[in-house]
Amino acid sequence: SSPYVMTSRQINIPYLLKIGEGKIAKIGKYLFDKDMTGIALFWGEGMEKMLGGRLKRGLDEHGIEILSEDTVSSIAVEDITAAAFSLPAGVKAVVGVGGGKVLDFAKYTSYLLRLPYISVPTSMSNDGFCSPTSSLTAGGARKTVKSAIPYGVVIDLDVIAGCPKSFLYSGVGDMIAKVSALWDWKAAFNRGYERFNDFASMMSYNSLDLLFLRHSSDPASPRFQRSLATSLLYSGIAMEIAGTSRPASGSEHLISHALDELAQKPKMHGLQVGTAAYLCAMLQENPETGGVRDILTATGFFDFVAADPF
């Protein structure tokens, strides 16, 4: 076919993006502004106790009705399907609050029902909170399945600041994985195996720059945490633009999946992919290898991983 033929595909990006302090209390206002008056609310374990008061006061103030509320402990597709099709009529949006499990559960629920999904991550451990895929189990096996990118993402930096250090370092590792992932993607394209999307690639690189070139390298600092949140958000959107996880996931993710299967005590996803990304960059003779080493040293990532090795 002619190289000049345009291939058009619909790309969805979040309409509602809020990153800042005290945002949990404002979710009611954001939903009201978008006319989402009835919601299904899914909590991660322990999250309702921690954040329920703040969130529900804001919902009450703006007349937002919780038509269904549940705490999620499973990511089995059978459970998600059952929950999705038992939601009451009148639900205008699905809201997920917590870590990866509940966000994937709520995201896939909204995808099945073609409802807007509002992602409210309580940690910055990876870019899944804004990706167009869900990590679920089907028949006991872990699967990454297509779903829809969130309609909205609300990140409360007060909540992120209270996270254990391991979550922040996991987020750093998931971001640094872009270096080896983008190299792999370009290599596959050069060998004729893949299509390449320059804009998605540029967006993924820019998300790295935003995090590591502009700000402090201390994961405990509020500026770093804001940048980490924004960078992971961009990474999720880059995957949506590319129509593939390639801008964010390469050989380092395959090593992490192998560790999940083989290691006696697998670590958090981002800690594994960050460590693997450095090894992959060396194998690739990636020109960014020195930068990866400097960042993982300066942020304290290497020291953190070394204190409790794989």
Locations of regions flagged by a protein language model:
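Short glycine/serine/threonine-rich phosphate/pyrophosphate-binding segments
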Residues: 49-51, 99-107, 126-129, 248, ...
